[in-house]
């Protein structure tokens, strides 16, 4: 009964890209940098995280979650998780987008629930 009234944690996601390129002709996307997830509320327990790259506001591409972020994570009030990430993905269709953002979701409880989204960062097109 108490689980019905459980609030989603107040999280903030920040991505500092070192590489962010969409290669339209080869159907590739390469994104690398530092991803930070901050807890702005009280202590929270995070499980079943997933990351999604949103290109141009509509294109959604699943990303591999950093190894340290898998499983059950305890994030104290004011705490943060930091990971150096690098993804190079081959797409089924070409993508041209001026900007992208990374969305952090959870699938705990059988539903996709967005937890935080990074501010948009420029995505170079080659």
What function would you assign to each model-found segment?
Residues 2-26:
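Low-complexity, acidic Ser/Thr/Pro/Gly-rich terminal tails and inter-domain linkers that flank the onset
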Residues 12-14, 57-71, 114:
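Short beta-strand and strand-turn-strand segments in soluble, beta-rich domains
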Residues 27-34, 82-84, 99-101:
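Short, solvent-exposed loop/turn segments enriched in Ser/Thr/Gly
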Residues 38-43, 91-93:
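Short, acidic/polar linear motifs in exposed loop/turn regions
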Residues 40-60:
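Short acidic, flexible loop segments centered on an aromatic residue
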Residues 63-91:
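A beta-strand/beta-hairpin structural motif
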Residues 91-101:
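Short glycine/proline/serine/threonine-rich loop/turn segments at secondary-structure transition edges
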Residues 111-126:
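Short beta-strand elements
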């Amino acid at each position: 009964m108490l689980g019905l009234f459980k609030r989603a944690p107040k999280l903030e996601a920040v991505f500092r890209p070192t590489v962010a390129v969409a290669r339209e002709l080869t159907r590739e996307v390469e994104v690398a940098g530092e991803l930070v997830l901050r807890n702005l509320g009280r202590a929270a327990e995070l499980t079943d995280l997933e990351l999604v790259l949103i290109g141009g506001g509509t294109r959604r591409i699943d990303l591999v979650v950093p190894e340290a972020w898998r499983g059950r994570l305890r994030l104290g009030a004011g705490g943060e998780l930091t990971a150096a990430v690098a993804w190079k993905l081959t797409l089924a269709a070409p993508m041209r987008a001026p900007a992208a953002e990374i969305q952090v979701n959870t699938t705990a409880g059988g539903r996709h629930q967005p937890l935080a989204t990074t501010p948009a960062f420029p995505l170079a097109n080659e």
